[in-house]
Amino acid sequence: MSTKPVVIRFFAPVIDATVNALMSAVDQKMKQGMKDFVILISSPGGSVIHGLSAYNYLKGLPASITTHNFGSVDSIGIVLYCAGSRRLSVPQARFLFHGVNVQFKGEQNLDEKLLEERLNGLRIDMENIAKVIAANTGKSAKDITDAMFERTTLNPEEAQSWGLVHEIKSELFEAGSEVIAIQFQQQPQQLPKM
């Protein structure tokens, strides 16, 4: 068995398919006795429920998790990044904080109770995200919420001063390491045939 950590390159949005692929890859390697993981992350964000679930899953494992921003970690991607007990970033990276939103489909009718339910859900999501990031940095939940409302972008040095990044490092993994790729490609639209 290799003594090198398992490297997982997560170059994808945080959605059902990619989070399930991440958890499956970790599960499979843990069944093989691996307990040391490096998750390389570059993500535009995505689904709050999937991001919080992935965070809780990775944090709850009897494994060593290192996360490494190799490009841009945005929105709920920051929560996934916080799953690392050791958090690294390349020098040319960024972290984007912004608030949670909800999308309504078509001409959906919303009564007062449904609007209230959606608004309460947004507030709880914001609180949960802020609590996770605050628990893993030197910032308070209010500081994080303010950063989200202000749509704050941090470079690696700023993220390090917040306690979000532990070390700025260009090297992603050792030569000869196994790399598992998780990516998402949207299917191209089919043009009508003539």
Where are the model-predicted features located?
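N-terminal organellar transit peptides
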Residues: M1-I76, C82-M194
